[in-house]
Every structure is written in C-alpha cells, then in structure tokens.
UniProtKB/Swiss-Prot annotation:
InterPro entries: Aminoacid_DH-like_N_sf, NAD(P)-bd_dom_sf, THF_DH/CycHdrlase, THF_DH/CycHdrlase_cat_dom, THF_DH/CycHdrlase_CS, THF_DH/CycHdrlase_NAD-bd_dom. It comes from the Bacteria. It catalyses: (6R)-5,10-methylene-5,6,7,8-tetrahydrofolate + NADP(+) = (6R)-5,10-methenyltetrahydrofolate + NADPH; (6R)-5,10-methenyltetrahydrofolate + H2O = (6R)-10-formyltetrahydrofolate + H(+). Catalyzes the oxidation of 5,10-methylenetetrahydrofolate to 5,10-methenyltetrahydrofolate and then the hydrolysis of 5,10-methenyltetrahydrofolate to 10-formyltetrahydrofolate. Pathway: One-carbon metabolism; tetrahydrofolate interconversion. This is Bifunctional protein FolD. One of its GO terms (cellular component) is cytosol. It comes from Leptospira borgpetersenii serovar Hardjo-bovis (strain JB197). Belongs to the tetrahydrofolate dehydrogenase/cyclohydrolase family. One of its GO terms (molecular function) is methylenetetrahydrofolate dehydrogenase (NADP+) activity. Homodimer. NADP(+) binds at G166, R167, S168, S191.
Length: 284
C-alpha cells in the first residue's frame, strides 16, 4: 500500500467550515457569538506572526477576537490583572496567552490564572491534571489536533506501540497521555533516553515533538509505521526525516500542512465549546 498523507490543511478547513456554519446560525437567531481574547506580551516577531494567524482564523469563521498587547517591561502582576479582567468578562469565552513571554514574567503563574472554563489552549495545571486523570477538560491544541487527524483517517491505535519523542508539557506529555487514553502502549522519550533509535524502530506510531530539525532519522522507522510530525523548524522541516521516511510509512503528516493547521482549528473549536459551556469530548 502506498503511504497516505494525513492532510491537516484539508481537515482544518472542514472543522472551520463547521464552526462557521454554527456561528452563522447563531447570528440569524441574534445569539451572542463566541469570542477569543489573545494576550501578547513583548515584541517577539514569531509571536506577532502566530497571534496574527489566530486573529485571522477567528475572523475567517465569524468568531469574535480581542487582542491585548502589553509592553516588553510588563510585570507578572500587571499581566495577572489583565487576565483577571478577561476572566470576569462574560463576553469572552477563551483566553490565550501567547508563549513565550519575556523572561521577567512568571509564565506558569499567568497560565494558571486563566479561568479553567476559559482555558481553551489547555495550558493550566488544572487542565493538565484532569487530562492525566481522564476527566473531561480542554486539551492542549496540537496533541488534540493529532488525535483528530487519526480519527478522521480511521487509524486505530488501540494495542499499538507508540513512541513520543519529546516531553514538553504542552506537546509531548499530553500527547502521550491522549494516546494512552486511546489504549496505545506508549513510550515517552527525552534527552536522557538511551538507545533511542532502537526504541523508535519498535514503534507502530512515531510522534516527533522534540523541536529539532529531522532529528528522527528515516532508518529508525519501521515499515508501515504511522508518522506524526509536530515539529516545525527553519527550512520547512519537521522533527522527523519525513522526505525519506514517508516512503516506508503507512500514514504520515507533511511539514508544512500536517499538524500545524490543526492547532489553530482546535483552538477555534474549543472556544466554540466554551461558549456552549461544555468541555472537549473524550478521545476514545
């Protein structure tokens, strides 16, 4: 069987169309439309780009959007005050603090100040804890986007060996937990993992979440593996050597156009869920 490309751009557009239809229906009934508030602290050019993409995505589906721009010298206390105001605003359904913040900001304190009911980016400690216990919550956007890609293509991970390379709290760790919820047998690898190539060769499913260009080599990949590349590095390459590895995979995500578009689609989807006062459905 020829390898099948997991087209995140196509699925992302499908999700956005569904959101757009629901918002248009709300407008015809004179109901309040969902609104996402995004906080940008400082002048990081990459963050500026990401925030612009999110605002454009909101407008594209008819969703309300508010951007709060704070200066480079903003203190943690000033940021927390802004978050408190957004928490109290009944017209704001989701709050996103763009990462990274300037070094003087206690980013964990800021994330955890976001109301659990408005944590549509799945970044609070409470959301992470509920995810680990299998309790309904809002999920980190990139891992949940990967889950939706798997489901869209009917890829059953139950009983399969999955290897996640990278253990960041917003990607690697939650990805491992979601795959566990889907009954995969998961190995979570990191910088101290020994014999990494041998571990990856045993995997039916490989998730690249390490943030290093083409770190996972093609000759580490077993025939028929599912390749899920969540990395995006200079040169339009991910964390897996996809250009070579895809030839003996069963399914693979391209870079760009695979996992990336799903992240913003999930952010919009979870903002819509929040506006309806329910959480993201279980992944099983």
């Amino acid at each position: 069987m020829d390898p099948i490309l997991l087209d995140g751009k196509k699925l992302s557009e499908k999700i956005r169309n569904e959101i757009r239809r629901e918002i248009e229906e709300r407008k015809t009934k004179n109901l309040r439309i969902p609104k996402l508030a995004t906080i940008l602290v400082g002048n990081n050019p990459a963050s500026e780009t990401y925030v612009s993409m999110k605002i454009k995505a909101c407008h594209g589906v008819g969703m309300g959007s508010e951007m709060i721009r704070l200066g480079e010298q903003t203190t943690t206390e000033e940021l927390l005050s802004v978050i408190d105001k957004l928490n109290a605003d009944p017209n704001v359904d989701g709050i996103l603090l763009q990462h990274p913040s300037p070094s003087q900001i206690d980013e964990r304190a800021a994330f955890d100040r976001i109301s659990f009911r408005k944590d549509v980016d799945g970044v609070t400690t409470l959301s992470f804890g509920k995810l680990s216990m299998g309790v309904e919550t809002y999920l980190p956007c990139t891992p949940y986007g990967i889950v939706l890609l798997l489901k869209e293509h009917g890829i059953n991970v139950s009983g399969k060996n999955a290897v996640v390379v990278g253990r960041s709290p917003i990607l690697g760790k939650p990805m491992a937990m979601l795959l566990t919820e889907m009954n995969a047998t998961v190995t979570l690898c990191h910088s101290k993992t020994q014999n990494l190539p041998e571990i990856v060769r045993l995997a039916d499913i490989v998730v690249g979440a390490v943030g290093k260009p083409e770190f996972i080599k093609a000759d580490w990949i077993s025939k028929g593996a599912v390749l899920l590349d969540a990395g995006y590095n200079p040169g339009n390459v991910g964390d897996i050597e996809i250009s070579k590895a895809k030839n003996h995979s069963s399914f693979y995500t391209p870079v760009p156009g695979g996992v990336g578009p799903m992240t913003i689609a999930v952010l919009l989807l979870q903002t819509l869920y929040s506006s309806k006062e329910h959480f993201t459905p279980p992944v099983q």
